[in-house]
Amino acid sequence: MASTTVAQLAAELSRSAAALLEQLQAAGVGKATPEDIITESDKTRLLDYLKRSHGQADDSSRKKITLTKRETSEIRQSDGTGKTRTVQVEVRKKRVLIKRDEAAPDAQADAVEAQAPVVDAVEEARRDEEERQQAELLARQEAEAKAAREAAEREEAERRARQEALEAEQRRQAELAARKAEEEAAASRAVTEANEDSSRKKAEDEKARVTAERAEAQKAADEAKAAADKARAEQEVAARKRREAAEAEARAIQQMLNAPPRVLKAPSERKAEEKKAEQTGTLHKPVKPAGATTEAKKDEKKPATTTTTTATADKKGKVVKAGWQDDSSRKKGSGLKTRGDTSGGVGGWRGGPRGRGGRQQQHDDSRSSFQAPTEPVVREVHVPETVSVADLAHKMAVKASEVIKQMMKLGQMVTINQVLDQETAMIVVEEMGHKAYAAKLDDPEALLVVGGEEHTDAELLPRPPVVTVMGHVDHGKTSLLDYIRRTKVAAGEAGGITQHIGAYHVETDRGVITFLDTPGHEAFTAMRARGAKATDIVILVVAADDGVMPQTKEAIAHAKAAGVPIVVAINKIDKPDANPDRVKQELVAEQVVPEEYGGDSPFVPVSAKMGTGVEDLLEQVLLQAEVLELTAPVDAPAKGLVVEAQLDKGKGPIATILVSSGTLKRGDVVLAGSAYGRVRAMLDENGKPTKEAGPSIPVEIQGLSEVPAAGEEVLVLPDERKAREIALFRQGKFRDVKLAKQQAAKLENMLEQMAEGEVQTLPLIVKADVQGSQEALVQSLQKLSTAEVRVQIVHGGVGGISESDVNLATASKAVIIGFNVRADAGARKLAEHNGIDIRYYNIIYDAVDEIKAAMSGMLAPEKRETTIGQVEVRQVFRVPKIGAVAGCMVTDGLVKRNSLVRVLRNNVVIHDGELDSLKRFKDDVKEVKQGFECGLSIKNFNDVQEGDQLEVYEITEVARTL
């Protein structure tokens, strides 16, 4: 076994040998020099010592657990001021649990049972020698350690003895000092007590003397005070009696002087007169009682000393009252009693016993209790959407004339019954110093919310998807639907383009699908927006040979705004010039990414003509519908959307409705915007009668009171009276808002027309077969307006052209446009008699083009200047009575009589005028061509010189186009 010295171990531990020797000696290992040998047992003892010195327990140490428990309580305690304080008291308890190691006996038993390894004799001898050496070393070390311990014990005993002796001496000294201090304190206390006894005796004697003197003085003062109080009381009683007598005498004299001569009446007659005055008086001008004049004169003679009125002196020196005090404060209290009386209760509801009492007391009370308003009253005015001038004045408690004056200050002339919009009314209220709030009307539509909550617990069942087909015009939307429906709808549309929004439901092998076919022409933007609003999935049809067009981009925007998934159908792939890859790239630029590029929009190549890819398209649509998990309640009142509406001459108003939830049945009461009614008949898209329609099914209903606006929400109500009430409320609201907006825009239009000058207007009356077409046509025509010619839509409606339309056109000098409608016999005869122009169209852009041409004819023609010749002045002749005549040579073009000319001298225009005469030799001629000489004179210009150039031109008018 390799031997290790103290120096080597110190080098391994990076410590000095001296420090290691000190630690070995402290651990009980007797090593004196760095060359001593250290065995493994020495190292173990050193390690155990180091562990104990650093607080680390060995393996045989006990394991303990300390448990700490805290309890908190409160104690209420009063302090010196009497306030109660709460003191928090915390009690801590600690418990230590010790567990002995159970593995030690087992480890010892295992160590005993372990067999010794087999070693040879040489190894045994070497080990015996090492053990002997270690035993000797251990004995030597133990002896040295024992000696060191004995020396340390002796030294510790000596140190402890010295410490005890020192402590005993200190205790003795402290006892002596304490005894001495006690003796000194006892002596001082004795002296102090003696001094205190003598001073206390002197103080008691002095206090007794002072108390006796003070008692004598207090007794004398009490006697003097009692005598003075008695004399003062006698004087006050005598003075009060004299003052009361004088006041009574003065009052009697004053009453005698102020009392006018009058006929005395019995109390019953006075009460009758007071009752009559109360009956004949009014709120603002109560009738004065009999004694009011006397009281008024009496008040005038009295000095004005009240704080609620101001007094001024007139020319005669008489005091005249000027203030807020009215006649009711001077009268006897027998006027008309009002709830808002401010006379201190004299003439009000809570007056004295029947208003009786002293007149002077009543007058003083009324004058002292009345308070004049110090600032104007600020009212909170709730302004509805529309309000008349009279109602607005009533809300502010002012006269209507004040509101009219304020409106005139704001630059508007109004009448008392004129309707103001909410914004204008709120401005007027704030200008007049009140607070304006937008009022919430008693809206009957709130009943719709309450009614809709009753059916929120209906069972939700799967419903068919609503698919809208959108795209550019002539890209094959309707043809694609034709192939799906196996019909020929496109051939029936005028011009081969769709001008109505069509709703169909198709039963396929995979389920029912409802299709909405929207127009692709640019004029039908609102129709496409309604289609996207009501849809679940959008099929975007793009022609493979045409690519992405403006209406394609618009359809993408509508679909994204509605948040519905898009399925792209690349149509017309059977054409030779079809390029589907170009279409994909263009759609990627519009943020429509195909699935193969990592997007979420499936692209399906189809051919509506050949039927290629149609089945794949339907499969993609149904796959998207499954992902959406479309559900709707069936056993509930129906809700839906007006897809299209029209007026039939025989059937009346007809509306195409797409049911979104619930079941619509024949006989239900429906509300659509401002139209209501009971469903008299219900037809499907094929014109066949049906009794009910579930979710996602389009139907055509009859029985409404008027033609509803396309896009309105349809609701089924249980009560027809409630439906009529809501419809009438919406009609009145729409009318009031429309009138208010028109009135607000009148002044602005007048100012615009004054600034722009005269503007040509083309008044039109538009009648169409369905609501959507009329709306699209009106919007397209209004877009044609320019700064010089403006389209004015006098009236737009649905249905045939009637006599009332012709009369309106006669009054407004308008042109009637009929889109897919005709005029009846009476209307035609009336139009011929009045010279009214009626135009019929069935294609929307034909109507737009003709109106555009008519507006172009109304434009002022454009004036263009054309140079027709150049003339050089060769010689100038002065002719009496005529002036200067220029002899000229036509160098370019020709010269005509009465042509316009410019005189250029050194390439500078010095005159612009007209020819007066044109002659060749002595003959008047109409024109002179290039290369010929002529003589000419210019109107109002005689300063012609040789070498001048004449530029001959003419102005032509050119018709302008939009």
From Swiss-Prot:
Pfam families: EF-G_D2 (PF22042), GTP_EFTU (PF00009), GTP_EFTU_D2 (PF03144), IF-2 (PF11987), IF2_assoc (PF08364), IF2_N (PF04760). It is found in: Cytoplasm. One of its GO terms (cellular component) is cytosol. Residues 462-631 form the tr-type G domain. Residues 517-520 are annotated as: G3. Residues 342-355 have a biased composition (Gly residues). The keyword ATP-binding does not apply. GTP binds at residues 471-478, 517-521, 571-574. Residues 52-87, 121-378 are annotated as: Disordered. It comes from the Bacteria. Residues 471-478 are annotated as: G1. Residues 607-609 are annotated as: G5. SUPFAM superfamilies: Initiation factor IF2/eIF5b, domain 3 (SSF52156), P-loop containing nucleoside triphosphate hydrolases (SSF52540), Putative DNA-binding domain (SSF46955), Translation proteins (SSF50447). Residues 78-87 have a biased composition (Polar residues). Residues 52-77, 123-183, 197-250, 267-278 have a biased composition (Basic and acidic residues). GO terms for molecular function: GTP binding; GTPase activity; guanosine tetraphosphate binding; translation initiation factor activity. Residues 571-574 are annotated as: G4. Its main location: cytoplasm. Residues 496-500 are annotated as: G2. Keywords: Cytoplasm, GTP-binding, Initiation factor, Nucleotide-binding, Protein biosynthesis. One of the essential components for the initiation of protein synthesis. Protects formylmethionyl-tRNA from spontaneous hydrolysis and promotes its binding to the 30S ribosomal subunits. Also involved in the hydrolysis of GTP during the formation of the 70S ribosomal complex. Belongs to the TRAFAC class translation factor GTPase superfamily. Classic translation factor GTPase family. IF-2 subfamily. This is Translation initiation factor IF-2.
